[in-house]
A protein has these predicted regions:
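Short beta-strands within extracellular/lumenal beta-sheet-rich domains
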Residues: 44-65, 120-121
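Short beta-strand-plus-loop segments that form exposed binding edges in beta-rich domains
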Residues: 141-148
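A short beta-strand element within beta-rich, extracytoplasmic domains
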Residues: 57-59, 63-81, 140
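Extracellular carbohydrate recognition and processing domains
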Residues: 100-129
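Enriched but not universal
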Residues: 1-21, 156-177
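Disordered, acidic Ser/Thr/Pro-rich linker "stalks" and the adjacent N-terminal cap
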Residues: 4-50
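Short, surface-exposed beta-strand/strand-loop-strand elements in extracellular ectodomains
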Residues: 83-98
Length: 177
């Protein structure tokens, strides 16, 4: 099935100040989280209950080219900076709200661990199927759980969809063969 990846493109300004952007060429969390490059660029936090809200880019596939949306799933990569204890982050859909999952990133000196969320076939609260307009306003909220410092290096959304079938009704009459 075809899929597209939606990357962070902004923060909504309501993030707490304790998520710090670090690394080369980054000035905000959305720029730090767009590629899975380990410790080259990332956001970090070690304060319990601190959060950041990330807005995602609009779909790269036109609405007319999508018959239906099969699922939406977050993809992430991170690590604990403590060599003995994992670091916990709760990742949830902010818009539409719901579907929170806890990610426990392993303790490691430099390697980031990939943790992907559950592929969600329906929207939170109500169970309605995903619509294209839902993809145009997606936000995720990351909340630090505990005080072990976490480095979050990648956050994206994978959207699996059914491709629209275009009918080939263009019959050629009067063609000169």
């Amino acid at each position: 099935m075809p899929f597209m990846i939606l990357l962070p493109d902004d923060t909504d300004g309501s993030s707490s100040s304790d998520w710090i952007t670090a690394g080369i060429g980054t000035s905000s969390p959305d720029t730090a989280l767009v590629d899975d490059n380990g410790d080259t660029s990332y956001v970090k936090c070690n304060d319990d209950n601190e959060f950041m809200i990330i807005d995602f880019a609009n779909p790269s596939v036109a609405e007319a080219d999508i018959e239906s949306i099969t699922s939406v799933q977050f993809l992430s990569s991170g690590r604990s900076s403590d060599r003995r204890s994992e670091a916990l982050v709760d990742i949830a859909f902010q818009v539409p709200s719901g579907f929170e999952e806890s990610c426990s990133y392993d303790a490691h000196a430099s390697s980031h661990e990939t943790i992907n969320g559950t592929a969600r076939e329906v929207k939170p609260f109500g169970g309605a199927v995903w619509e294209y307009s839902d993809l145009e306003n997606l936000e995720m909220k990351c909340t630090k759980d505990g005080t072990e410092e976490v480095y979050l290096g990648y956050l994206a959304l994978k959207v699996i969809y059914e491709q629209a079938v275009s009918a080939d009704n263009a019959t050629f009459f009067g063609a000169n063969f």
